[in-house]
Regions:
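Catalytic cores of processing enzymes, dominated by hydrolases/peptidases
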Residues: 267-317
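A generic structural motif
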Residues: 21-26, 222-228, 297
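Active-site loop/lid in soluble adenylation, ligation, and acyl-transfer enzymes
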Residues: 1, 65, 75-94, 98-189, ...
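Residues forming anionic-ligand binding surfaces in small-molecule and nucleic-acid pockets
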Residues: 206-226, 312-317
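Active-site- and interface-proximal helix/loop "cap" or "latch" segments in soluble metabolic
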Residues: 3-85
Length: 317
């Protein structure tokens, strides 16, 4: 989903706006990503072409939304039926991308994908001799976010071996995506009351509801060569191939769903996020996954401002 918050003057004229959501942006730097969003926001206010803005940032790629969805969210916010009042809160409207609808996993996963198992196995076999697997000790949510980006940048710089890190959480958390709005995604007062830390990760995607012992989280820090020649969409399947195969060997009916989800016949059971860290001729890909197996859905619904659309494919009860 992409959301646009619009601030209007006394006459109802849009003065500024802010784009947020669970989309991803791949770029050479944080500055490039922020510049793209800033230029898109300016184009919305001035009614300029969003496609021209995207074309002017060839080093950036948006995944999970597009200019049509962004423009639609902005138009809905501006033309909201709520009368603009001086000093009233900015209006925020979210909309899903028409190119990436949130289809329930039971439907979406029926789409046949080419079988790339042999290619994925070859890539993993090539990576395996260099790969270190670490079952990490419990860390606070802030520490988890910091170490994830630090280790990814170290692999990118060649100072750390490719690594799989299995997380342990020291406390409950809500982890929001790189471009999400905390106040829009989380009931911050309730989260604080219940002892949840709200932290932002360095990758895009949606909010994760974490309670220690109820989730499995892992990160893969791999050289960028591991995903060389593979589209961003396909790289999610490559990075999670070993996990899906392992779950199937345990007798579980799991498959890939949408861009970045892992699903069973009951719905979504896990979600992934990914980001590339290009550095000269090297670089790294950070890919992390959280699978929830015992969610307290009632508590989650209190802590998160989760839309009905986003909940439509979640295997919770």
């Amino acid at each position: 989903l992409v959301a646009v918050t619009v601030s209007v003057d006394d006459d109802g004229t849009a003065q500024s706006c802010h784009i947020s959501g669970d989309f991803f942006i791949e770029s050479v730097s944080d500055a490039e990503s922020h510049a793209l969003l800033h230029d898109l926001e300016r184009a919305l206010i001035s009614d300029d072409s969003l496609r021209s803005v995207l074309d002017a940032h060839p080093s950036c790629q948006i995944i999970g939304t597009d200019e049509i969805a962004i423009k639609t969210a902005y138009s809905r916010a501006v033309s909201s039926n709520l009368p603009p009042l001086a000093g009233a809160p900015a209006q925020r409207v979210g909309v899903g991308s028409p190119d990436a609808p949130n289809i329930p996993a039971s439907i979406n996963t029926q789409t046949k994908q080419p079988d790339k198992s042999s290619e994925y196995r070859e890539r993993w076999n090539a990576l395996k001799p260099q790969l270190t697997v670490i079952h990490d000790h419990p860390r606070t949510p802030d520490e988890q976010m910091a170490i994830d980006e630090t280790w990814a940048r170290e692999v990118a710089a060649g100072t750390r071996q490719p690594t799989i890190r299995l997380w342990e959480w020291a406390g409950p958390a809500v982890v929001i995506g790189r471009f999400q709005s905390a106040q829009d995604e989380v009931n911050l007062d309730i989260a604080k009351q219940l002892g949840f830390d709200v932290v932002r990760r360095c990758t895009g995607g949606g909010a994760m509801f974490i309670e220690p012992g109820n989730t499995i989280t892992y990160s893969l820090y791999a050289p960028l060569d591991f995903v060389q020649g593979v589209s961003i969409e396909e790289s999610y399947r490559l990075c999670d191939w070993w996990l899906v195969e392992a779950l199937r060997e345990l007798g579980l009916d799991v498959r890939f769903a949408g861009l970045n989800d892992i699903a069973s016949q009951y719905g979504k059971i896990g979600g992934a996020a990914q980001r590339r860290f290009p550095v000269g001729s090297g670089g790294a890909v950070l890919h992390h996954v959280t699978m929830a197996y015992d969610i307290d859905a009632a508590k989650m619904s209190r802590v998160l401002n989760t839309s009905r659309e986003k909940m439509s494919d979640k295997a919770v009860k």
